[in-house]
Amino acid sequence: MYKEKLETATQLYKQYHQQYNAVAFARLIDLLFAIVIGYKAINESSWLWGFLAVLMIVLFFLLIGKHKQIAVKRRIAKAKIAINEREIAFIEQGVYPADNGKDFEPAQHPYAYDLDVLGEKSLFHYLNRTHTYLGRKRLAEQLLYPEGTAILAHQEAIKALTPQLAWRQTFMAHAEQIDDSPSFYDRLQQWAVTPTPPMGKFMRVFTVISPIVFTLSAIIGYIYDYEVLKSIAKLLLTINLSVFFFYISKINKEKLGFERTYAMLYAFKSCISLIEERFPDKKLQASKPIAQLSRLLDDLDNVSNILVSIPLNAFSFYHLHRYSALQTWKATYSKEVLPWLETVADTEVLCSFANFAYNYPQFVYPTLNNSYRVSFEAVGHPLIAEKERITNDIVLDEAHFVLLTGSNMSGKSTFLRTLGINMLLTQLGLPVCAKKADVHPLPLLVSMRLSDSLSDGKSYFFAEINRIEQIMAALKRERCMVLLDEILRGTNSEDKQYGTIKIIERLLSLQAIGIVATHDIEVCRLSKQYPDRLVNKCFESDISQGVLHFDYKLREGICQNRNATFLMRERGIIA
């Protein structure tokens, strides 16, 4: 499908490019005709040639408008080409198409670091099809803090948008025209909350009447040589320019930081228009106000250009009228503008999720239960290529807290991440990498990888104790899914074994659901004391004809094989 879309977008781009060049040539010819006809009109004092010259000038400006329209269509077609090329490269070569979200990585989080949620080749990197800074930020927020209460609504929204490939790509192409940054939203927020003193009623009336009186006085006075009218015109010119120069600093202050942002706001307007068409029930009605703001900022952009602004404001107070209109806009819409832009970001995230569902039609939407039970049939890691992915069945509930054993490299950590990622996908309303899934969407608590922090003076063991303390505190507040991988690695074997057993018993007392992976066989014997709560499962390795094999399939019971000694002998480390 992406190759078909790529071919269509390429043809459209070629078509618009030809039209763009044709209109550019027509503009040039029209301008030349306007110059020649205008010269003829002046030279011959002919009203007919003058009328034709005016028509040529009007046509020239119409062609400018047409040229801009075609330029926008050409940019959108080019963006669609890039979108489809990236999707093809992602599917065929595994090339991630967008930003990895590493800049949103929190210092501490219950699962983000352990499950590779952000950063290179992370879940964010895999899902992300956003372009705006705000879209990226919203995606990171949803991955880090999913709304577990609206899963079914999210599922329905994703299901509805998944088949709408053409609409999604059009929306994404328009979003790619937005060149935003964190500072833009900071400035916009500051501008929105900063009150602007409105122009007084007298000044509003004066800016309408004065240019009219000035223009009439100047025309009549100089045509009929009326000195009184000439004096009035000169006086009003001085007053008009004085008023303009008084307000120019206010105008510049009001638009400070928004120079040349009108094009970006217009791109936002295009995205909002698409949202209004696709989701009429939202009753957004924001595209027109955003377009108005874009035009007002555009109109005020040349206020500092004296060659333009002096004649404009002497004859019409043009910039003051636009400034007054901006004040009116601000008073009406300033509190709504950021939520409108956030709607674009939310739709970018929804398109990213729908894109994921579209790319993986074999994934399933999990059913939800209220019985604190997690059941996956043929669950696999969604970020592992299908031809390399090994799937397993698992059930976790009050009677099935799993003690997981396995030799080195047998797949324990990958399996824990598989469960964690699919639980997160469930909370996001996304389909999961499984044949069947029935899930209670429990909050995730994970401890799999930690590190020393020399700058903080904290050891690995101290960091792990802190993490376990945080997990226990969270479990006191609510029931959670816990995934722990080889805990207490920073202490001696006897202390580690005793500590691990006590932690597992504490997890059971707090009604946690989940898995603890361990190499310690004695820890696994704890299942005899809690036969109604604990079950042993394992991953095995096999040494056949001097070769180590893994099948990465989950089995019942405790791991029986060890491979550390074999690997060290193979590498010549030990005899």
Question: In which residue ranges do the predicted regions lie?
Answer:
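ATPase nucleotide-binding head domains, primarily ABC-like/P-loop NTPase cores
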Residues: 353, 360-575
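Alpha-helical coupling/stalk and coiled-coil linker elements that connect catalytic or binding modules
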Residues: 1-407, 414-444, 466-467
